[in-house]
Amino acid sequence: MKVHKGDMVLVISGPDKGAKGKVIAAFPKTEKVLVEGVNRIKKHVANSAPERGAESGGIVTQEAPIHVSNVMVIDADGNPTRVGFRVDENGKKVRVSRRSGKDI
């Protein structure tokens, strides 16, 4: 998957289109990412279940995963870009910006 934890992304489709946020978690098997402040849902949590963002239960607002095709990585210039791969001189695979050609 070309989007990793810690990347800044732009949402390009859906109700939160245009929102920017940091990737909290990436789920490669389902091709989904959890973006900070995007796709927020209300979840009813029991008092005994310690969930992400829950103190003592009740109704909790938290982020839900969105599909990786609905986000674009923001490069160092602040522009949304597609991500490609290249092999560097050490034989390691590196992510590169398709817009500028620089390493991400």
Curated annotation (Swiss-Prot):
KW Calcium (keyword) present: no
GO annotation terms (biological process): translation
Pfam families: KOW (PF00467), ribosomal_L24 (PF17136)
Record-linked PROSITE patterns: RIBOSOMAL_L24
Family stated for the protein in its record: Belongs to the universal ribosomal protein uL24 family.
Subunit structure: Part of the 50S ribosomal subunit.
Protein's name according to its UniProt entry: Large ribosomal subunit protein uL24
Species for this entry: Corynebacterium efficiens (strain DSM 44549 / YS-314 / AJ 12310 / JCM 11189 / NBRC 100395)
Gene: rplX
